[in-house]
Amino acid sequence: MFARLAFGAWPGSPQVAISVRMAQTAKKDMAPPASAPTPMMAQYLALKAAAEDCLLFYRMGDFFELFFDDAKTASACLDIALTARGEHDGQPIPMCGVPAHSAEGYLARLIKAGHRVAIADQTESPAEAKKRAGSKALVGRAIVRVVTAGTLTEEALLDSRAANWLVAVAGAGQGADRRIGIAAADISTGRFEIAGLIPSALDAELARLDAAEIVVPEDFEEPPAGAVAWPREHFESVRGEERLKRLLGVATLDGFGAFTRAELAAAGALIAYLERAGQGSLPFLQPPRRRVVADHMMIDAATRESLEITLSQAGVRKGSLLDAVDRTVTGAGARLLGADLSAPLTDVGAIEARLDLVALFEGDGALRERLRGALRALPDVGRALGRLVARRGSPRDLGQLRDGLDQARLLHELLGRAAPMPALLAGLLPQLVGHDELVDLLRRALVATPPIDAAQGGYIAEGYDPALDALRGQGGEGRKAIAALEARYRAETGIPSLKIKHNGVLGYHIEVQAKHADPLMTADSGFTHRQTLAGVVRFNAPDLHEQAMRVGQSGEHALAAEAAHLEELMAAALGRTAEIAATADALARLDVAAALAERAAEGGWTRPHFEPHSCFDVIGGRHPVVEAAVAAQGARFVANDCRLSDQERLWLVTGPNMGGKSTFLRQNAAIAILAQAGSPVPATSARLGIVDRLFSRVGASDNLARGRSTFMVEMVETAAILAQATERSFVILDEVGRGTSTYDGLAIAWAVVEAVHDINRCRCLFATHYHELTRLAERLDALSLHHVRAREWKGELVLLHELADGPADRSYGIAVAKLAGLSPPVLARARDVLKKLEAGRAATGGLAAGLDDLPLFAAAAQVEEAAPDPLRHEIETIDVDSLSPREALDILYRLKTLAREAAE
């Protein structure tokens, strides 16, 4: 699957047209036959019709409520209680709800389960509604946002160390002229990419992005798994060009590149989708980067999965190549490192620029440690900016900008003295500064640790606004006066437990225990009864009311003043959106370079060197994931060389299972990825020619969803390699042909080796158990034979994991089966069958010769009788009851001697 989450159709598609009609029908059905729905329910039904196939979070006070089928779905998904509110057609209306203050966690679970959620929030307070339409007025509500997997910005809903891509795909042209356009945006950071490609490259590009959500036209042929179908009208290239120009605020797109019709269609659809999700407002998007596919190593979906580049076979980060390499200390750095490994470069100059920066930090351990220490304290500037632009920001986000930009200035001072100065660092340094005015403003305006919730105030620093300070002073004096009133009331009433409390309904009030309430109930007491509860009675008094009014008014005015300042501060920050985004990107690049330097120093990695010809010369190469796993067990990874050249561009590798063939293949593919991503590599030395495309056919499993067996999956992947690999490609093939009959598999493997050698002419490592393939070395000039070494010692197989020249003498399959725990009778039978097969092949040259000599019923095969065991015989002859102590001691010594002789 290309999308991590699968979703249904979007409003406007044929599927949704059906759901809309159903919603309209349901709306009619929900109306009681004898009476209209209540005003609140009528409002809900109208909003639900607008939300269409999304779950509707309907704000009621401090909760988001869901009704009808939405409630049933949410209660099952969230494991919360399903209750009822009112009736419909004589039946209770299902209802469930979640607290508004903790809604993000529930949203995350719903999104992960594949749902989309429309947020219907209150657009006014109850007090404002009363002013507008009287005491029975219904609070206004509107859908303010549609939450989908690709439109998230909240910290609680995102993985801090992974990008969150929303992708739109569009096509243009027919037949050989057909082209695909892709627009991808991570709105949490504003990153925006546009690319054009041929249809056959679509799967590889989607695999690179690993999108959270994919949007395609409703009539798109063979849509990616989990894609959202959207009306074709949103994918018109002319409208797409207009949307893109409006987004960028330009009259022409000439300054951003020559976009194709397909690219404009995809970009326009992406922008329209984001506008729909934001209910008319757009999130933060940087100017689009036009991605040229040829500038990056092409890696298809099957190869990414088999090499476990960013995710392991289990679908998690742990155990992946990224996990083994990652030493970043910021979320932004981790995201950038993942992007680098997912799209290695093909331009030697750009690769060397990255390696130069890594070399600077690797060579200066003190500088590297100071840099990493400073980066550890950095907030996620990019995502804080994304939330602010999307109008989902908080005072804390402004505080993160303040702290992050201030730290960037200090890093500029630290790194500005570096010598020699790498070109990449020289380009990054100017992006770290220029924010002094904004940082100074935020430092003066905000408290040291601003809160997430702006509703309660308290985030504007004292001294920034004298008028605000005066309002706060009035509120403080009022609260002191209320405390004095509490002491006075206690003295006047003689009730020592009397308290003045505050809540959102009654405001400030006097509370006494019920047993003390009667004297306060009298008309001349000076107190007014407000509420009776179990055990307590609540009152008000004129002077308390007067002080409460003063506190309330000053508090309201203070909150309004803080809100106005918050808007001013946000506007100041958003006025530097592009510059702040550039700083965030520069900080991430520094983190990646320092992290790779740390990894290289930690693991003894080396800088790769690039050659103009198609060599692949790696000395002492290692697999970083396997090496880490082996080291954790206290063992040492066995390094191996891989020396491909124009004269030996295809290595045929044989040897036993578990001998290390697959690891050898994968480690060299991993080295190619790391090198072209701009990273040192786990080897003693490495000289490489640029790899334009990387292919891996290692391991396979049934694809039941698409009706493909393991062998069919293997053949589809092999066919793709033979069709797409060029002379600059690097291919690893493991056990091609093993999923069918021996003769068929051997024939296919033979033909594939010939095709790779004669037609594709690419660098290739081919692992096999078909020893017959070694004959190809006699006529294929650029093919050389190699094997992983193994020995048998005292009947046991010893796997050396070393690569040697020449073919393996045998596969040691039965020895490996013994290691796996097959029973002695089965192993004995296997040896008997193997002897007859090998004897037949030696006599006739036929693989199946000798089968006729085997007994008809294999299960009846006789197992060789075990040799006599002297130790066992000695024990069986002992008469325990007749032994004297001295005889027993002599027998023990004799048994010990027999045991030692048996062990030898």
Curated annotation (Swiss-Prot):
Residues the entry annotates as binding ATP: G655, P656, N657, M658, G659, G660, K661, S662
Keyword Repeat: no
Gene Ontology terms for molecular function: ATP binding; ATP-dependent DNA damage sensor activity; damaged DNA binding; mismatched DNA binding
Keywords for the protein's UniProt record, in alphabetical order: ATP-binding, DNA damage, DNA repair, DNA-binding, Nucleotide-binding
SUPFAM superfamilies named among the record's database cross-references: DNA repair protein MutS, domain I, DNA repair protein MutS, domain II, DNA repair protein MutS, domain III, P-loop containing nucleoside triphosphate hydrolases
GO cellular component: cytosol
Source superkingdom: Bacteria
Listed Gene3D superfamilies: 1.10.1420.10, 6.10.140.430, DNA repair protein MutS, domain I (3.40.1170.10), MutS, connector domain (3.30.420.110), P-loop containing nucleotide triphosphate hydrolases (3.40.50.300)
One GO term (biological process): mismatch repair
Family of the protein in this entry: Belongs to the DNA mismatch repair MutS family.
Function field: This protein is involved in the repair of mismatches in DNA. It is possible that it carries out the mismatch recognition step. This protein has a weak ATPase activity.
NCBIfam families: mutS1, PRK05399.1
Name of the protein this chain belongs to: DNA mismatch repair protein MutS
Species of provenance: Rhizorhabdus wittichii (strain DSM 6014 / CCUG 31198 / JCM 15750 / NBRC 105917 / EY 4224 / RW1)
